[in-house]
């Protein structure tokens, strides 16, 4: 996880740390170079080793977290991965990931194939993988 603040005057987008895209990584999948792994870091921590989540709702439930991929070399997205997070319920958030292909990938919206639905978001020192 990144431990830095970005943007003008070290501020966050709209004053909300949950909207701060801190890093983006893309690399080939080990053992299958025909596939890629994409990682997006958001919401920087305030210290090198925070004892837990820095706030009770680490992802904004009104934001769209999105990665767009251009596979045609024309600077227009051909694939989009869109992640929405629920409001915190009982101290936990859930995530839904959609994959959008074709012309709709260049825009925004709720369409696309659901890849992961309602997955529990892991925070703190206990991680879970879907």
Task: Identify the function of each model-found stretch.
Residues 1-130:
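Surface-exposed extracytoplasmic segments
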């Amino acid at each position: 996880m990144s431990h830095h603040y970005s943007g003008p005057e070290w501020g966050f987008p709209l004053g909300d740390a949950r909207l701060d895209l801190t890093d983006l990584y893309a690399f080939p999948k080990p053992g299958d170079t025909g596939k890629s792994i994409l990682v997006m870091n958001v919401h920087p921590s305030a210290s090198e080793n925070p004892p837990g989540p820095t706030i009770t709702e680490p992802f904004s439930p009104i934001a769209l977290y999105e990665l767009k991929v251009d596979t045609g070399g024309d600077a227009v997205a051909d694939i989009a991965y869109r992640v929405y997070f629920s409001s915190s319920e009982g101290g936990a958030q859930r995530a839904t990931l959609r994959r959008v292909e074709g012309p709709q990938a260049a825009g925004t919206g709720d369409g696309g194939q659901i890849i992961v639905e309602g997955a529990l978001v892991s925070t703190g020192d206990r991680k879970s993988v879907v």
